Amino acid sequence: MRVLGIESSCDETGVAVYDTGLSGSAALRAHAVYSQIALHAEYGGVVPELASRDHVRKLLPLVRQTLAEAGLGVGDIDGVAYTAGPGLVGALLVGAGVARSLAWALEVPAVGVHHMEGHLLAPLMEDDPPEAPFVALLVSGGHTQLVAVDAIGQYRLLGETLDDAAGEAFDKTAKLMGLPYPGGPQLARLAEQGTPGAYRFARPMTDRPGLDFSFSGLKTQVLMAWRDSDQSEQTRADIARGFEDAVVETLSIKCERALEAAGTNVIVVAGGVGANKRLRARLQQMAERLGGRACFPRPALCTDNGAMIAFAGALRLQAGQYSPPKVDVTPRWDMATLPAV
C-alpha cells in the first residue's frame, strides 16, 4: 500500500510517500519538507495567518516533487494520510483540504492522523524498530510528554509539562540572550562552546515524586544569570551550556523514573528536541545502564515532516480505519482518545 502523507500543523509543509510493501527505512520512498523559518523570522515567532497562506502556496508543488522523487504518478497512490490535529486550525485545514480532495479524486481512502502520534511512531520507520511496550518521550516546541505505549494506538499519559515545553524553553531562553529566531537550535550549537559547570541551574521538579515537568522557572534563572553577567560571548556560551545541561538531566531523570513506573527498559524519543546531540547521548547511556535501548528517528525526522504522517496513516489504513469523507480537523486533541490499531 502506497500512502501519501501530508503535514501542515504549524510552520513546516511536509509531504512523503510510504510503501508498506517495502521493509525498514527503504519503505519511505520519498519525503520533502519546506520550512517557513525565513517567513516568520522578522516576527520572532509563527504568525498563524501567514503560515496558512504559505501552506496554500507550497503544498501542491511539494506533492508533485515528492511523487516525482518516488518515481510514482498520482494514480499510484492507494491512500492519503494528513495531520488532523493538534495544531493551528488554519494550517491544518489547508492540509486536510488538499488530502481529502486528492482522496476523493483518486477514489482512495483517507485518514486524519494525530500529529503527536506521528512523532511517537517515527522511530519505528528505522531499521530494527522497537516493539511495544515502551515509554515515549515526546519533546518539542509545543509538547513535553512521557507516554506509556502498550501497543500502537494504546497510550497512557505518565507525565507532561505544567507550563513551557522543553523546545519552547529553548527558544525563549535563546531569545532573552539575544540569539536569532529560531533560537533553540542556535542555543544548542552555542552550548557546544560553553564550559561545563561554569553555570549550574536547577533541575526542576526532580526533587519530588512524579513525572511532570516545569521549565518556566529555569528560564527565569537563566534570565537573572544573563542580566547579572558581563554578557560576553563566552559567558553567553557558558550559560547556554548550563541551561542545556539542566534540561537534558531533567529529561533523563524523568525518563528513568517513567521506565521504572511502566516496567520496561526501552525508551523512544521523538519531536524536534529529540535531535539534540547531548540529549541523545545522555539517554543512550541511561538505557544501556538499564540493559535496554534508546531509540530515535534520524534527525531529519525529528522535526515536523510528512513521513511520520504517512507511516502512522498507513498503519491505520491497513487496520481499516478511515476518516469520514469531509474536511475536518481537531486543533486540540487528546492522544489517549485514539483507537487501537
Curated annotation (Swiss-Prot):
It is an enzyme of class 2 (transferase). Fe cation binds at residues 115, 119, 304. InterPro entries: ATPase_NBD, Gcp-like_dom, KAE1/TsaD, TsaD. It comes from the Bacteria. It holds the Pfam family TsaD. Binds 1 Fe(2+) ion per subunit. It catalyses: L-threonylcarbamoyladenylate + adenosine(37) in tRNA = N(6)-L-threonylcarbamoyladenosine(37) in tRNA + AMP + H(+). GO terms for cellular component: cytoplasm. Its EC number is 2.3.1.234. Its main location: cytoplasm. One of its GO terms (molecular function) is iron ion binding. SUPFAM superfamilies: Actin-like ATPase domain. The keyword Transcription regulation does not apply. Keywords: Acyltransferase, Cytoplasm, Iron, Metal-binding, Transferase, tRNA processing. GO terms for biological process: tRNA threonylcarbamoyladenosine modification. The keyword NADP does not apply. Substrate binds at residues 138-142, 171, 184, 276. It is found in: Cytoplasm. Belongs to the KAE1 / TsaD family. PANTHER family: TRNA N6-ADENOSINE THREONYLCARBAMOYLTRANSFERASE, TRNA N6-ADENOSINE THREONYLCARBAMOYLTRANSFERASE, MITOCHONDRIAL. This is tRNA N6-adenosine threonylcarbamoyltransferase. The gene is tsaD.
